[in-house]
Regions:
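Beta-propeller blade termini and top-face loops
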Residues: 1-185
């Protein structure tokens, strides 16, 4: 049974369940076109969605600090120890509007990065802009006991002990190709 359809160009690539309420799910749709010599990542079909009725209805998460520009792949995680805390690793258009003033004050900030919500997705704070090669990895994992210790795979695997404010490399000296993560509880 199909429970959510966005478009013929988009599919769902990540889902995270609220550990305190299995009826609450977050899912990310990703619009992309890949050919033998190109990848177009992002478009109107890329979005973050939430359901509180086990998928009967879905609402797109918009506003509240979440990027309003064109998005690409979005990785998701809900903190097991505090289900109000949700992380999203967002690939987003870095230039949502033409920049007319090329001075530093006129430049637009990049929207790519790790976002954190402390209120189950109602509002979002951009924690950092570390999202290298987002379309390829975009895995986010939260320590089962500490909602502020978060890991995310880009190039390389990064981690933070303060909810994403401070970023450290978790894989120094190890090849950068990491497609899955698991945290030993």
């Amino acid at each position: 049974k199909r429970i959510k359809f966005v478009s013929d160009k988009a599919g769902f690539v990540d889902i995270a369940m609220d550990p305190a309420d299995p009826n609450t799910l977050y899912a990310s749709s990703w619009e992309r076109v890949r050919g033998p010599y190109f990848l177009k990542s992002g478009g109107p079909g890329s979005a973050l969605w939430k359901t509180t009725d086990a998928g009967a209805t879905w609402t797109e998460i918009k506003g509240g600090g979440f990027p309003a520009t064109t998005k690409g792949r979005i990785g998701l995680a809900v903190a097991p120890s505090n289900s109000k805390i949700v992380y999203a690793l967002v690939e987003a258009d870095s230039m949502p509007n033409p920049v007319k003033n090329k001075s530093p004050k006129g430049r637009q900030k990049l929207q790519n990065g790790l976002y954190r919500s402390a209120d189950a997705g109602a509002t979002w704070t951009k924690m950092n802009d570390h999202d290298e090669r987002p379309f390829y990895y975009s895995e986010v994992r939260v320590d089962p006991k500490d909602p502020n210790r978060v890991y995310w795979s880009s190039t390389p695997v990064n981690f933070s002990d303060d909810g994403g404010k401070t970023v450290r490399n978790a894989t120094v000296g190890i090849h950068v190709d990491h497609h899955a993560m698991w945290i030993d509880p």
